[in-house]
Every structure is written in C-alpha cells, then in structure tokens.
Amino acid sequence: MSAPAPVPDVDGVLARASFADDGLLPAVIQQHDTREVLMLGYMDREALRRTLTTGRVTFWSRSRREYWRKGDTSGHGQYVRDAALDCDGDTVLIQVDQVGVACHTGTRTCFDADHLHPVTGARPAADEGPTP
C-alpha cells in the first residue's frame, strides 16, 4: 500500500508568492514528462489555492473575470503533477498531465502557430569567456 500524498503547505506557498498589483500571478503550464510548454495563464490567490489542493489547474480569466478549469467544457483537462514558484516568487510553473489539446485553437500547445524567426546567438567557446 502506498503512503498518502503529503498535504501541501498552501498558506506557506501563498505567503511566498508575489502577486502583481492586479492580484495575479503568471502560471506557465508544462507537460510533466516531455517538458513541452503548453500555455500561459493567470492565477489569483484562490486559483493557486484550488490548483494546489484539487489536482486540477484553475485559472482566473482576465477577460471574463471568473475562475475556469481547462477541460470543464472541452474535456481537455490539465491534471497537476508538480508545481514550483520561481526564484522571485512572481511566476509559478505547473507541471501537468495534459489530456487532449491545451490551446483553445485546437493545437497541442499555444506556442505552435507563429514562429518569430529571431536572430539566434551562439554560445561562446570555453576559451572565449568574458574578458576580465
């Protein structure tokens, strides 16, 4: 028999999280096994609390001004596998098991459609490090 999952210290996480002036925290959603970035959403304190305690990702919709869970209408759910605040506490990474597509356009990820073709840089060789 496996041990029950530990109960998260939600109050501690909420105290460490640094929400913006509008009360929101960017949430990067990533497929847990492939590390594919699926989408970016926003969470307020309650959405983050729900995400950490229910096993389903909950967002705050800035346009509709309401909570929503990916998959409640489409069936394309996001099931929490792990979560971490960044070093400043002002962004959260939620690793999920994505069922179906993540994007409302019907694509796997919200970042598939428009590649920007930036100028890319090359990492300097070991002997070409910064000049002292």
From Swiss-Prot:
Co-factor(s): Mg(2+); Zn(2+)
Alphabetical keyword list: Amino-acid biosynthesis, Cytoplasm, Histidine biosynthesis, Hydrolase, Magnesium, Metal-binding, Zinc
Sites where the protein binds Mg(2+): D86, D88, D90
Catalytic activity: 1-(5-phospho-beta-D-ribosyl)-5'-AMP + H2O = 1-(5-phospho-beta-D-ribosyl)-5-[(5-phospho-beta-D-ribosylamino)methylideneamino]imidazole-4-carboxamide
Predominant localisation class: cytoplasm
Gene3D superfamilies associated with the record: Phosphoribosyl-AMP cyclohydrolase
Pathway listed: Amino-acid biosynthesis; L-histidine biosynthesis; L-histidine from 5-phospho-alpha-D-ribose 1-diphosphate: step 3/9
A single cellular component GO annotation: cytoplasm
Residues annotated as binding Zn(2+): C87, C103, C110
EC number(s) stated in the UniProt entry for this protein: 3.5.4.19
Family matches, as InterPro entries: PRA-CH, PRib_AMP_CycHydrolase_dom, PRib_AMP_CycHydrolase_sf
Database matches in Pfam families: PRA-CH (PF01502)
Cofactor note: Binds 1 Mg(2+) ion per subunit. Binds 1 zinc ion per subunit.
Family classification: Belongs to the PRA-CH family.
Function: Catalyzes the hydrolysis of the adenine ring of phosphoribosyl-AMP.
Subunit structure: Homodimer.
Name used for this protein in its record: Phosphoribosyl-AMP cyclohydrolase
Species of provenance: Clavibacter michiganensis subsp. michiganensis (strain NCPPB 382)
